[in-house]
Amino acid sequence: MSTPVAQSETVSRPDSQRSASVGVHTTLRVLDLLAARAPLGLSEISRELGMPKSTVHRVCNVLVQRGWAVRDHETRFDLGIRALRLSGRAEELPIVIAFRTVAAEFLALHDETICLAVLDGAESLFIALEETSHPVRLVTSVGSKTPAFASASGRVVLAAQSNDEVGATFPHGSLVTPTGRRLNGLPELFSILAQVSENGYAENWEETAVGLYAASVPVRNERGNVLAALTTCVPTSRITQERRDRIVADLQAAGQRLSQFVAWLPTFAARR
């Protein structure tokens, strides 16, 4: 015999759960639309989805903050690096298309691997690369990650941030590189980043892989924001002081050229 359930005992979904469900549904609808037709402005998204502009504005701001969307200089929205990683559309990014031209020029000069990376939380994420023809080379691929505090690409992006921002990314202060070098906490990292900022480029001598040298320069938009890092990776067996100087100089020129191509772009940093 079943026991009647009193009215006060009836199970119902809490308002907070209903609200969260609606919020997720709204967010996914915005992402679906951006995947199909971006870039779009707030008014266009609002009209297409039949949503209040204030709701669209709130959702898009959260997506931008989390790296799922980006906003251009005309305040239109497009998919961010996190969404592009899932959709496989990274090759369509304007910055990646422009990178191919700059990379070809650099390879013609030095025949060394050149990569494009963005900051993804506490890690540096490769979104494009062109490889050297040498049999001895860095073995990596698009989608690979390295600790931002240890890599040349990560450091060149972190150097554009304040100490407070960097400290928030690495709150525990335990900084050991993949090859076992232990930094003396955040103070040493801050010192390294200050030097990177002063030099205009970052270097890495065997901190992410034994036998590997890397140099990286920032790619900036017209506002001076760092969009990405342009990085070359060279086995230490092929590096001399003279060759290192030429590589860094030509990499800086390549970074400036790429910055000119993508001056209008917003940032791609994905925050956790």
For each of these PLM feature ranges, what is it?
Residues 2-10, 135-208:
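Short, solvent-exposed recognition segments
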Residues 2-96, 256, 260-264:
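N-terminal helix-turn-helix
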Residues 33, 48, 98-109, 115, ...:
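Amphipathic alpha-helical regulatory segments at dimerization interfaces
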Residues 75-173:
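Amphipathic alpha-helical effector-binding/dimerization core
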Residues 108-109, 206-211:
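Short loop/turn motifs at secondary-structure junctions and domain boundaries
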Residues 192-194, 199, 210-211, 226-272:
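Juxtadomain coupling helices with adjacent low-complexity linkers
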Residues 213-217:
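Short hydrophobic beta-strand micro-motif common in sensory/regulatory domains
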Residues 219-222:
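Sensor-regulatory modules in signal-transduction proteins
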